[in-house]
């Protein structure tokens, strides 16, 4: 795809972790995530840093285009700086996480459901569940659950609902 874009004179911006990688070398522009070597099969670190990098790029693009004020941009950037602290808070709640893991370890199917942006999070969460725990998992758009998928939910199925957008509370 990258080479096809280059053949058609389409500028290519890559978001990569490895300096000097083949994608970086063939791209016109490169943003590096500097995540370091990936140890996990699930590539969680690479995925997370690429997502953050693209989010930051989008915020600056919005500011350049006049869609957001500089004060809004600065506020959003401050929230990103706080992410490591927020992740540390989640990890510090080890007892609660372990409780959930013990309670649901016997699930033979895990369904992640979400709407809008949360559906994308569900897709990645489902992939991580499969890659790390070897448990069958699927992601579904919350609005589609009633069209046949709901019949798959039975004893031994865990449903994880993801809702991060308050304006979708009523629909989800």
What would you call each of these model-derived segments?
Residues 1-172:
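A SIS-like phosphosugar-recognition module
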């Amino acid at each position: 795809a990258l080479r096809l874009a280059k053949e058609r004179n389409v500028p290519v911006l890559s978001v990569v972790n490895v300096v000097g990688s083949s994608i970086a070398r063939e791209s016109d522009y490169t943003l590096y995530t500097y995540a370091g070597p990936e140890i996990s099969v699930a590539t969680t670190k690479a995925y997370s840093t690429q997502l953050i990098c693209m989010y930051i790029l989008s915020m600056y693009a919005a500011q350049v285009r006049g869609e957001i004020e500089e004060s809004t941009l600065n506020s959003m950037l401050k929230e990103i700086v706080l992410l490591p602290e927020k992740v540390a808070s989640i990890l510090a709640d080890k007892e609660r996480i372990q409780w959930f893991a013990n309670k649901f370890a016997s699930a033979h199917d895990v369904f992640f459901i979400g709407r809008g942006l949360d559906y994308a999070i569900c897709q990645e969460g489902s992939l991580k569940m499969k890659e790390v725990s070897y448990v069958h998992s699927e992601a579904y758009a919350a609005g589609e659950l009633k069209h046949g998928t709901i019949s798959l939910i039975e004893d031994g199925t865990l449903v994880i609902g993801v809702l991060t957008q308050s304006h979708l509370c009523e629909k989800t």
